[in-house]
Swiss-Prot record:
GO terms for biological process: proteasome-mediated ubiquitin-dependent protein catabolic process. InterPro entries: Ntn_hydrolases_N, Proteasome_alpha, Proteasome_alpha-type, Proteasome_asu_N, Proteasome_sua/b. Belongs to the peptidase T1A family. The lineage of its organism: Eukaryota, Metazoa, Chordata, Craniata, Vertebrata. It comes from the Eukaryota. This is Proteasome subunit alpha type-7. It comes from Gallus gallus. Coiled coil: none annotated. It is found in: Cytoplasm; Nucleus. One of its GO terms (cellular component) is proteasome core complex, alpha-subunit complex. The 26S proteasome consists of a 20S proteasome core and two 19S regulatory subunits. The 20S proteasome core is a barrel-shaped complex made of 28 subunits that are arranged in four stacked rings. The two outer rings are each formed by seven alpha subunits, and the two inner rings are formed by seven beta subunits. The proteolytic activity is exerted by three beta-subunits PSMB5, PSMB6 and PSMB7. PSMA7 interacts directly with the PSMG1-PSMG2 heterodimer which promotes 20S proteasome assembly. Interacts with HIF1A. Interacts with RAB7A. Interacts with PRKN. Interacts with ABL1 and ABL2. The keyword Repeat does not apply. The keyword Cytoplasm applies. Disulfide bonds: none annotated. Keywords: Cytoplasm, Nucleus, Proteasome.
Length: 249
């Protein structure tokens, strides 16, 4: 039997190959990173260069699900569009029914459940996306979750998905500390530093989404805004290098 063609059949060694292939599609996608700060959550994505005549506003890897929740994804954009639309409808339905916005975990669990159903149904295939979902609960607590094509989800302090995820996670493990997220600017810099590990051409290929407590989502697409942070990061690197040289001399 061809186990890699059947969506709902396990191989003898316990694999669901279609789910694993969906995870491979995620690994080929643009890098996306997320960091949970003290009073801020930040998403950053690697921007791919667009065709000369293409409107780059139509190429977005970050989107709002509700006033208090935002999502970035890696993988197949068409699949992401279905998940995003379903999640937005669920957010609206929750507001109408409960008269409160969704919690970040609630909508993450909804998205994860949707993905999981597509791993157990005939005539469907798994969604080829992973998502980073950030936001604030109504008590002001910042949240960051990650979901994958199998339907699992976990809470994180900082994480990455997409083709550069492994390198970025190593960077986060080295640099993520309470001091590194002490202020909003430091949290934003941490995201940009991590993306610079895998993104060429500096700030012009980076897009950021910033959400602060009790403030609306702000998406930074202007290269000038991001280059300002990149210049500060480069300056800090140079100063650290000079300090190291003084110590060794």
């Amino acid at each position: 039997m061809s186990y890699d063609r059947a969506i709902t059949v396990f191989s003898p060694d316990g694999h669901l190959f279609q789910v694993e292939y969906a995870q491979e599609a995620v690994k080929k996608g643009s890098t996306a990173v997320g960091v949970r700060g003290k009073d801020i959550v930040v998403l950053g994505v690697e921007k791919k260069s667009v065709a000369k005549l293409q409107d780059e506003r139509t190429v977005r890897k970050i989107c709002a699900l509700d006033d208090n929740v935002c999502m970035a994804f890696a993988g197949l954009t068409a699949d992401a569009r279905i998940v995003i639309n379903r999640a937005r409808v669920e957010c609206q339905s929750h507001r109408l029914t409960v008269e409160d916005p969704v919690t970040v975990e609630y909508i993450t669990r909804y998205i994860a459940s949707l993905k999981q159903r597509y791993t157990q149904s005939k005539r469907r295939r798994p969604f080829g996306i992973s998502a980073l979902i950030v936001g604030f609960d109504f008590d002001g607590t910042p949240r960051l979750y990650q979901t994958d094509p199998s339907g699992t989800y976990h809470a994180w302090k900082a994480n990455a998905i997409g083709r550069g995820a492994k390198s970025v996670r190593v960077e986060f493990e080295k640099n993520y500390t309470d001091e590194a997220i002490e202020t909003d600017d430091l949290t934003i810099k941490l995201v940009i530093k991590a993306l610079l590990e895998v993104v060429q051409s500096g700030g012009k290929n980076i897009e950021l989404a910033v959400m602060r407590r009790d403030q609306p989502l702000k998406i930074l697409t202007s290269p000038e805004e991001i280059e300002k942070y990149v210049a500060e990061i480069e300056k800090e690197k140079e100063e650290n290098e000079k300090k190291k040289q003084k110590k060794t001399s």
